[in-house]
Amino acid sequence: MNNNLQGDAIAAAIDVLNEERVIAYPTEAVFGVGCDPDSETAVMRLLELKRRPVDKGLILIAANYEQLKPYIDDTMLTDAQRETIFSRWPGPVTFVFPAPATTPRWLTGRFDSLAVRVTDHPLVVALCQAYGKPLVSTSANLSGLPPCRTVDEVRAQFGAAFPVVPGETGGRLNPSEIRDALTGELFRQG
């Protein structure tokens, strides 16, 4: 197993994801760590790595809206709300949608909703397309440390053997904006 994900980085990353492990990859502003959203084992590994409580809920990042549909309930959206969301995607805006009862609690935490984003980062788009589904995505940093912005910073925080998809972040300074899909309420400024 090649932990450095050299050569065909996307195929190597998918191999790691299929082993229910966590990977790091560049996103719009910082490096993210992510895993298979359908694997409780993988999500628990990510939460342990980040020292993040399960009740906080997580974000899914996807190549397209279709990848997110199994995890969210968009039946209450009006045409105007859909237009607002789709005008911001793909891009650095995360929307919180109602979640159906079938969405695992290891993703939603204590909430009946799930934060999701359709990314515009080409490497993450390619990764999610090749994987065939979204990834759990949270900033690559250990508790109390700043988010990683380079491969070297990821290796400094998580160790030289941590699987990293090499690449550059999208250059944005701030993490994604987070808004409620139904009300438009701003939860986090981007």
Swiss-Prot record:
Its EC number is 2.7.7.87. The keyword Metal-binding does not apply. It is an enzyme of class 2 (transferase). Residues 7-190 form the YrdC-like domain. Belongs to the SUA5 family. TsaC subfamily. It comes from Escherichia coli O6:H1 (strain CFT073 / ATCC 700928 / UPEC). It comes from the Bacteria. HAMAP family: TsaC. One of its GO terms (molecular function) is double-stranded RNA binding. Pfam families: Sua5_yciO_yrdC (PF01300). NCBIfam families: PRK10634.1. Its main location: cytoplasm. This is Threonylcarbamoyl-AMP synthase. InterPro entries: DHBP_synth_RibB-like_a/b_dom, Sua5-like_dom, TC-AMP_synthase, TC-AMP_synthase_SUA5. It is found in: Cytoplasm. One of its GO terms (cellular component) is cytoplasm. The keyword Electron transport does not apply.
